[in-house]
Structures are given as C-alpha cells and as structure tokens.
C-alpha cells in the first residue's frame, strides 16, 4: 500500500517507517522538517523516503499528503507536560487529529489508523481494558484530554461506518530515537533521585516501540471496517518497577 504517515520523524513514526519499508509498503512521510527526516533515515538505515512538508493543524497542507495514498497512519502528537505546552497539545492532538481523520475519510482511504492512547480509557470499568471501554469522563491530564478529543472524532467516524482503526498504546519505550521520549525522560528523572519516589499502590504499563510499529503495519488491510486494538504491553506494579530499574542500572 501507499501509506501516508504523520509524525514520521517521531519515536513511533520512525520505527513505523522502518516497519513499512520492511513489509513492502510505500510510505509518504508528513514532516515539519526535512532535516529531522534525514536524521530518522540515517538512524534506521532507510532508503530515501517520499515526504510532504506541512502543518498538521492546516487542512490545506494535509491534502497533498493524502492525495494518491491508499491508507494513513496518524501517529503525530504532542506529549509534552507543563502548562505552557497546553495550547500546543490541544492544537496538535485535538485539532490536528480531527483534520487528519476527516480529510482521510473524504479521500476514501482504507484503513485510517489513529494512534490514540491507553490514558483516554483510564480508569477502565471493572479494572480491565477491553475494546468496549468507553472514553473516560475524567482524563488524567491535558494530554489524555486532548487525545480523547481526537478519539471522539475517530469513534464518530467509526459509527458512520468509515474504516477507522483505533490503536491504544500504553507507555512506549525502546531503542533508536532521534530525540528522547516522554517515557525515557520520566525514567531518567526517577533514576536521578537519591531514593526512587514511587507509590506503593498501582503500577505502569509499558511496551516496546517496535511491537507498536509491527501492529500498525499489520493493520494495513483494507475492507475490514472499523476496528479497535490495545497495545498495552507489560504491567509492573510500582515495587516491581523499582526492583526492575535497580536490576538494570545497578
């Protein structure tokens, strides 16, 4: 398939580009910077990748990306923290996602893959994540709130019969990132503390970015209609997380 991919220079996007090329697909990257795409190509040892420069919040700049493509994978998102980042988080994750999803349905792409977040489902009814989970009425932070806004659009389009595929990743970790992921920054902060300040209840879900890239690639099957999949990975409670971090860092 000829596949448009947003967020192509990000952590998930870079690994997804690699997986798409390995699987015989033809990716078209949507980027803000050619130089960062060059860095991703070098890091993952990829051939030259076709690309379109633009701004995800501009519907007009997205149209050339989607033209002549068969499918789209929407990985672009802002996962920053702090009050100063809130306007950008809302603009990219909510407005940008609406733009990609609606324009992709207008272009009759199949499938239309939306990378959401496990955080939009938390806490799950009954304590278990399933494909029947509703969007949480109490988002845990502004990031989750913005991703939920995007997922409301995705679910609406699913209800209308459009071939939208919703993917829920949890904490994404792994190698080969041109930057430093939010999960990696969080782990680094913990490791710098004299005593790891973890609560004694609850825990964390994490998975390898390469597994997510594989899932996204394998979802590129047309004529299967709306779908939802969780990529939740492995659960460690906080005491187990502390033991694990100590074991790998000494």
Question: Where do the language-model regions lie?
Answer:
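Conserved Rossmann-fold NAD(P)-dependent oxidoreductase catalytic core, especially the SDR/UDP-sugar
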Residues: 95-143, 165
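Conserved beta-loop-beta element that borders a ligand/cofactor-binding pocket
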Residues: 152-176
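A conserved pocket-lining segment of Rossmann-fold NAD(P)-dependent short-chain dehydrogenase/reductase
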Residues: 186-207, 211, 215-218
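Mid/C-terminal beta-alpha module of Rossmann-like enzyme folds, strongest
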Residues: 215-250
């Amino acid at each position: 398939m000829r596949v448009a991919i947003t967020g192509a220079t990000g952590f998930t996007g870079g690994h997804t580009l690699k997986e798409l090329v390995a699987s015989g697909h033809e990716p078209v990257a949507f980027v803000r910077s050619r130089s960062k795409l060059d860095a991703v190509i070098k890091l993952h040892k990829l051939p030259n990748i076709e690309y379109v420069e633009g701004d995800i919040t501009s519907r007009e700049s997205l149209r050339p990306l989607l033209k002549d493509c068969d499918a789209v994978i929407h990985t672009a998102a802002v996962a920053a923290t702090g009050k100063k980042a809130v306007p950008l988080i809302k603009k990219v994750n909510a407005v940008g996602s609406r733009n990609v999803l609606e324009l992709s349905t207008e272009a009759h792409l199949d499938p239309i893959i939306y990378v959401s977040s496990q955080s939009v489902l938390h806490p799950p009814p009954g304590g278990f994540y399933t494909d029947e989970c509703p969007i949480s009425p109490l988002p845990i932070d502004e990031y989750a709130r913005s991703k939920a806004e995007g997922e409301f659009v995705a679910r609406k389009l699913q209800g209308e019969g459009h071939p939208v595929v919703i993917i829920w990743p949890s904490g994404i970790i792994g190698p080969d990132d041109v930057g430093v992921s939010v999960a990696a920054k969080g782990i680094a902060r913990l490791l710098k503390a004299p005593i790891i300040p973890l609560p004694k209840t609850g825990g964390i879900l994490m998975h390898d970015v390469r597994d997510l890239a594989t899932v996204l690639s394998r979802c590129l099957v047309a004529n299967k209609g709306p779908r939802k999949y969780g990529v939740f990975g492995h659960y460690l409670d906080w005491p187990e997380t502390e033991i694990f971090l100590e074991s790998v860092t000494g």
